[in-house]
């Protein structure tokens, strides 16, 4: 099998997610379950397509502190729980060339 799919619902974010892992790369598909949720509003405003890119990091809080010190605007000033039990935080697209950027850390590593 070339890829593995894992699905789950993120009720607080009003989305369903599906992950496809190909080697070391993981692709996450998002399906809005509510037009008033963050992804539903994004689709209404910008249309379907790429929502964000994500990067795995070690030391998420330290990374957030580092990029904030460099002038990057943070959406999340502290990590929060995301899909697959990861700790996540988002950087504002105005600071990342118009691309919503997610930083992820596996708390089990």
Region roles according to the model:
Residues 1-2:
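Short, small-residue-biased leader/transition segments that mark boundaries at the very start
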Residues 6, 36-41:
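A short, acidic/glycine-rich surface segment
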Residues 10-12, 45, 80-83:
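A short beta-turn/loop motif at secondary-structure boundaries
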Residues 18-21, 40-109:
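Vicinal oxygen chelate
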Residues 29:
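Carbohydrate-associated surface elements
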């Amino acid at each position: 099998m070339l890829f593995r799919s894992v699905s789950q619902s993120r009720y607080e974010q009003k989305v369903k997610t599906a992950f496809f892992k190909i080697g070391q790369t993981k692709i996450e598909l998002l399906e809005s379950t509510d037009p008033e949720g963050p992804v539903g509003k994004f689709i209404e405003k910008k249309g379907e397509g790429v929502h964000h890119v994500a990067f795995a990091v070690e030391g998420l809080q330290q990374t957030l502190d580092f990029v904030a010190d460099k002038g990057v605007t943070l959406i999340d000033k502290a990590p929060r729980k995301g899909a697959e039990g990861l700790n996540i935080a988002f950087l504002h697209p105005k600071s990342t060339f118009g691309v919503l950027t997610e930083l992820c850390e596996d708390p089990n590593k």
